[in-house]
């Protein structure tokens, strides 16, 4: 009898707990909160289906006036990945990624005139989608910047034969993680200001 009472109380307790809102149980929120920058890879290949999913996720991003002013340079050639790593040591392309994806702004698709630089916002949103998709699929990735350093951007343009209207925003190495970086809580209440700066 005592055992039955204990089991009943445990069941009631579990039911009560399960009714409490738990944000981290939401898969999308959990992916956002647990994403980390992965800089070391095993060298294993990823499948075409995985690569397709990454690029579809990137292109699902919002863009100003729905211009979608982006292009994605997908580098799978090992020699070219190594060359990127040599030219851009911070890019982590020497750390055995399966692929290096370079999100770019396509100025021929950008909003004309004074709003042309909105492509930076748009391609940044696409890049974040790419990072989140990689994490959700059990892959690792890291955002390594090029733009607005036009010397770096120009170097990549020349290395990959990109036309002048295709501006590389960053290099994103993607692969099977060889490390598990610590998940950090970056939330800081002092960064929040309601109804103005107070």
Q: Where do the model's predicted regions map?
A:
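Acidic, surface-exposed loops and disordered segments
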Residues: 16-198
């Amino acid at each position: 009898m005592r055992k039955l009472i204990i089991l009943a109380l445990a069941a009631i307790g579990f039911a009560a707990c399960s009714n409490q809102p738990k944000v981290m149980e939401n898969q999308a929120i959990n992916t956002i909160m647990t994403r980390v920058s992965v800089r070391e890879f095993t060298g294993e290949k990823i499948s075409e289906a995985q690569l397709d999913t990454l690029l579809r996720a990137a292109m699902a991003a919002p863009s100003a006036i729905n211009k979608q002013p982006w292009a994605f340079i997908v580098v799978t050639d090992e020699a070219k990945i190594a060359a990127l790593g040599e030219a851009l040591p911070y890019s982590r392309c020497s750390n055995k990624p399966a692929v290096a994806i370079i999100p770019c702004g396509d100025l021929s698709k950008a909003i004309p005139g004074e709003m042309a630089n909105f492509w930076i916002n748009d391609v940044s949103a696409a890049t974040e989608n790419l990072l989140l998709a990689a994490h959700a699929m059990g892959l690792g990735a890291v955002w390594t910047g090029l733009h607005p350093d036009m010397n770096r951007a120009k170097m990549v343009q020349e290395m990959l034969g990109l036309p002048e209207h295709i501006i590389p925003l960053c290099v994103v190495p993607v692969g099977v993680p060889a490390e598990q970086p610590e998940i950090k809580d970056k939330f800081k209440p002092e960064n929040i200001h309601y109804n103005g700066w107070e």
